[in-house]
Amino acid sequence: MTHITSRKHAPRVSLLATATLAAGFAPLVAQAADSADAGSRNATELDKVQVRGSWFNPSSPKFTAELLDTPKSVSIVSEKLIAETGATNLQDALRMVPGITFGAGEGGNPTGDRPFIRGFDSQSNVFVDGLRDVGSQTREIFDLEQVEVVKGPSSAYGGRDSGGGSLNLVSKTPKLKNETSASMGIGTDSYARGTVDANYVLGDGIAARLNLMKHESDIAGRDAANVSRWGIAPSIAFGLNGPAQLIASHYHMQSDDLPDAGGFPYGNPNGAPASKWVDGRPMVPDRNNYYGLVDRDFQRTRADISTLDASYDFGGHKLRNIARLGNTSNDYLWTQPDDSQGNPNNYGTLWRRTNSRAVDVKSFADQLGLTGAFQTGALKHSYSAGVEYSDEKMTRGSYLMTPGTSNPLTGNSKCPTTGAATGYNCADFANPNPRDPWAATHSVYRSDKALDVEQRTKTTSAYVFDTIELNEQWMVNLGLRYDDFRTTLTTPVAGAAPTRVRNSNDFLNYQAGVVFKPAANGSIYLSWGTSSTPPGMDGGDGSDGLSAAVADLKPQDTKNLELGTKWDLLDNRLNLTAAIFHTVMNNARVTIDNGTSQNAGKKEINGFELGFTGQLTDAWSLYGGYTYLDSELKDNGFVCAVSGRTCPSGIYVPSPNNGNVFPNTAKHSANLWTTYRFPIGLTLGAGAFYSDKQYGDVANTKWIASYTRFDAMASYAIQDNISLQLNVQNLTDKTYFTKAYASHYASIAPGRSATLALNVKF
């Protein structure tokens, strides 16, 4: 077996290299009528709108109408908004979209991307340029043009889906223009970041683009933890000025972090008597406390993704094939604080439990599609049709320790004392020392690769979309997708044959909407969509895994009814949207009264969204939104009426959690970001972000409090091509939590940080 020596992370050194949402508000019909004379939105007008920073249309060819006329809630975070707010990863960018929260610690992703959209876990619903991006990751933004959030059941667009929505990350590609931009930033907490984005025209219709990134920093308001990553993304395009185009690209990113789940245990752990409980909130003796170990904990990730995108425009119809090979790895060993053992309540100490994983995901995906427009009589059609195939292979091991992490004085996880006698597996809850010499008496090694678990997932799909323009006021949007989904989990057994668990399902999903246009610059729509969530949809590297208990079950089915409206106002300077929706899952996987898992549960969510984005004047831009989510676990199955891990037959009773709200779901959330550019070259910006109370568990006993966070930005144009930008995040140094784990802990947000970047364009 291979032995691993955990290294102490070195001090940071300064580095270098370079670095909306089209959602809205209720329509004001009187103002809408004033803008109606603008007429229909032709290509020239669309260019004008995008220059103003108003509507940004989705990149996916499966959207067969402009965003204004698409009967679905879609939020887009533009590259400009990402840069203004100082975002450096996907989680930073998504705070601009209300209705998205983040989960903690599940499925091999302790500190990575686990977004919840409209109350549903969407970790496995992330796409890059329309192809599913498998493998747990913390995604960077240095190679992104925009982030698209499709809300509501989306299986008609992407196949297997959790029911809340999906994310599509749009990569930067070459263009016929010579330009280079670079950004070099420093900041508090040893922050150093550099990015370069260089685009060159190489010949007739040929261009190349190179994006580079290096990032290092500590975590604001946290001891010990730090991040270190770098990335490179080259691409080349042929035929940019003709009907036949070919784009080849590669994305590489790797990180080596001292991970910080930001974990603080809840005040009501199972391991302590109720008389010593505080309440369901996390206990925080000092926000800076880091309960991990510098000489033990690590997280190392790597992503290599190669893409070939070929297309031919026949004139009115376009054939496109995009193929991708992906290889990602995520190796980590990190400290989970106390694991509900109750040591902080009982003794004022904490047990340093470890979580580890060594996972590799290899994937191939190919999508062949045809898009275009045609007319049948008086009906105008805009269509998209295609087929897809994907093959994903996940292998998963872990890291082991000698000796283990139990307290040698008690032989278990109880920690009446701390220090060397406990092998430093027990720490002082109020004053932990992350530099305890744990490695002096312990070793870490990778588990036997021959015993790695493997999950293989293959999917074959076909889809068709059509937007039918009946007349100037009425449109119909239809979409249909078929998926054949097959996944197998293989678990090796030493000295015996491996065990295998399989799930094979095919499912049909659809999207249907009717759009009424009372004016050329507005729309009112009613839509209906579905999604399917099969067992093992995460491919073995997420929070919805395959097991013998669920292998024979059908997919969970989610349906969504949505009524919404979208408007362009003030000569397309302001875009407003509003939507109300009802989402229900009628066959959720739950335990029934004989102790088995069945598709017998029900949960639903009713919600309301408002949003606005626009360039109100040449100097003033505004972006914001509000989301209301009223969730309920209608039928959460049955639970054992007696304590113990084995329940006698006939002792199951209806779940006491029936009627509770969804975990990781904020009832109210809102955000506002605005900038104003003064004639002297100075631009000032400010943002406010609100999230309501969230529960971590279905019992609604573990929770994190509501919070409001403020950010600020100032930039100054030294010359036309040189500027300085200052960002201050969490301006008031608010102590708050962003992620609530189901049982053990919650993740604290970073404290106040400030960064200053020099941005150059030439």
Predicted regions and their residues:
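Conserved C-terminal beta-signal and adjacent last beta-strands/turns
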Residues: 6-9, 18, 359, 371, ...
